[in-house]
Amino acid sequence: MPAARTVARSDARGRGRHTLMRGPRTRRTVAVIGAGLAGLRCASVLQAAGYAVTVFEQAPAPGGRMRALAGQQWHCDHGAQYFTARDPDFMSAVGAWVANDCAAPWLARLASWDGSTLQPSRGTLQRFVGVPDMAAPAHALAVGLDLRTETRIDALQRTEHGWALRGAGLPEAVPAELLVLALPAPQAAALLETAASDLARVAARVRMQPAWAVVARFTAPVEAGYDGLFVNAGALRWIARNSSKPGRVGAETWLLHATAAWSHAHRDATPAEVIDQLLPELPALGLPAPLACEALFWEAASTESPAVADACVWEAASAAGLCGDWLAGGKVEGAWCSGTALAQRICAYDAGGRD
């Protein structure tokens, strides 16, 4: 391996300096850890370019924070709530998702709350959601990929020919020539700490914020005067009527997201304690007492500003890279652009750029 350690980055729009998607001269193996949108996008581009790609995901299904909670006759998006599209490549992808009925525009009535006044939002930004839930685009992107769910990678080891991956669900070490980590920054830093310290330091510089999510179920439709509410006072920061999104069926469900500060202060609380403390916020926001609630804690829900301003990071010396929304401004579109950018860096590296 080269003695110099070069950490190369691409711009935050996800295009990078190299846009030619030329594959390797031989069919090289790539291990992608994390099946959120960034990992799936990176994997799909690399596979189309001729790489042999395997994606490892510790959860039962792909999607990352594009996920929904479900029970008997109800379900609710409890992570990412919607996405927008500005990047031309991502706009094209969203158009394809809409054409294939796995996404649709969300014509939501949005408002904001400052603690005393409910103010309707009059913006024209178009928002999209997955159909029948936010995980649908990730499931569509995973089609045709070698995806190993319920497989947690616990250890990485450098080898003469690349990498060896070990973890729960793997009877033996899995070899790979190239490595992609599509994980939240703290997880990536911990996994790379001894195997690729330069990459680990990049991830360790990023601080991510937690969020408590509460799914509230009601016996009948609730008319609060809005479908999505940006809350600028109190413990909550966002409320959404999940049932207002296209393709949703079942019981009336609403999603509550707590602020990062409140979530951090209550990170050790039980779900029942969180529900008890957040429900008193609802009457002022026009919501009645729910029939039942579920609560879930997101350890890394968003990136604390300032975030790393690069769409991806590639370390040629270790043949490993990082991608994720936290590298490209956050949000669903950022995840897509980051995955694209890293795939481009890898293709350029194998095409002879070696940076």
What are these model-predicted stretches?
Residues 149-163:
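A conserved short coil-to-beta-strand element within the FAD-binding core of flavoproteins
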Residues 47-71:
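Glycine-rich FAD pyrophosphate-binding loop
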Residues 282-318:
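Flavin (FAD/FMN) cofactor-binding core of flavoprotein oxidoreductases
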Residues 63, 71, 176-226, 288:
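Central helical "cap/lid" subdomain
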Residues 215-267, 273, 277-286:
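Active-site substrate-recognition segment that forms the wall
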Residues 82-86, 118-140, 268-274:
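Short beta-strand to alpha-helix junction loop
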Residues 28-55:
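N-terminal Rossmann-like FAD-binding beta1-loop-alpha1 element of flavoenzymes
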Residues 68-110:
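N-terminal FAD cofactor-binding segment of flavoenzymes
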